[in-house]
Swiss-Prot record:
Zinc finger residue ranges, CR-type: 134-212
Cofactor list: Zn(2+)
Keyword tRNA-binding annotated: no
Matches recorded under Pfam families: DnaJ, DnaJ_C, DnaJ_CXXCXGXG
Coiled-coil residue windows: none
Family assignment from sequence similarity: Belongs to the DnaJ family.
This protein's name: Chaperone protein DnaJ
Primary localization class, coarse: cytoplasm
Quaternary structure and partners: Homodimer.
Amino acid sequence: MAKKDYYEVLGLKKGASENDIKRAYKRLASKHHPDKNQGSKEAEEKFKEINEAYEVLGDDQKRAAYDQYGHAAFEQGGGAGGFGGGFGGADFGDMFGDIFGDIFGGGGRGRQRVVRGEDLRYDLEITLEEAVKGTTKDIQINTLAHCDSCGGSGAEKGSKVETCPHCHGSGRIRRQQGFFVSESICPSCHGSGKKIEKPCRSCHGEGRVHKKENLSVKIPAGVDTGNQLRLAGKGAVGENGAPAGDLYVVIHVREHHIFERDGSNLYCEVPISFAIAALGGEIEVPTLDGRVKLKIPAETQTGKLFRMRGKGVASTRSGYAGDLICRIVVETPVNLTSEQKELLHKLEESLQGKDLSKHAPKSSGFLDGVKKFFDNLGKSDK
């Protein structure tokens, strides 16, 4: 089945900005996260698709390659790879090294290929508080670890491990036809360069077995959804004692019930009473460090923004903290008593008349506009 266009997966058009890509990824990853759609295979596949798209479009170099060549840029070792299928693949450096080595003196001659293990991915969901302040999380991964029975050699204890007679230990078979030389993986030893007399029964000669492994991951302060933490050597081990790949921990920050995050800034809505909005006063607003007092000037309207500097998220690069931006929402009183309603009626009456433009300029302007509209409408009918 043909792969979907990565831009379409994220609901974007080609040429979308870096921020657009990040916002789309955060929104879709949160919507289709397996924890929110337990048991849904469709959501799980969609989540993988979204992450694969962001893995490419969220990286400038990979995105440039994708824009030019499409999915072909990442097939057969084209560069992007994928978490689910491993980050490995053919290495262009090795490929060209073999070609030019053959032409200019056989640089790759007799060299044994050591193929390291696959890179792994782990999706980790954390709270906003943990993302802002940093934390340590214990995780469990499914991986390929060294076989305890054979110590990773792939051979039964006491069994001989000899040099492969077909490739003489290089792990590669070379064939020459006229001026052309081709090289391929040795079919006898599968590239290991060794022949095992009796393969280990526990790992069937691979030198590695499936295991669950517990790890402790340190999350630095300031991480955001889509950030990746690389744990070198914590991926799957390679066959027959080859080194391990890396583990990539991909961060997903859970939605917060009060704050919204945009980069290093935090946003929240702060409701205030009708009286405080009109007369002014002092209120308490929440921050991730605790409650902070905020002075509200008289005649504050809904939508007014107050910036609290340094109360946002510290950048992982610069270390400087962003701001907390509070948006005021004037709350209309409800469940009023008869006495309270009477007081509001009196207030309304006192604000009407000639002084309306002074006390309620927007209402006055709106009413004047409505009057002019109907006056003009009446003239056009005549």
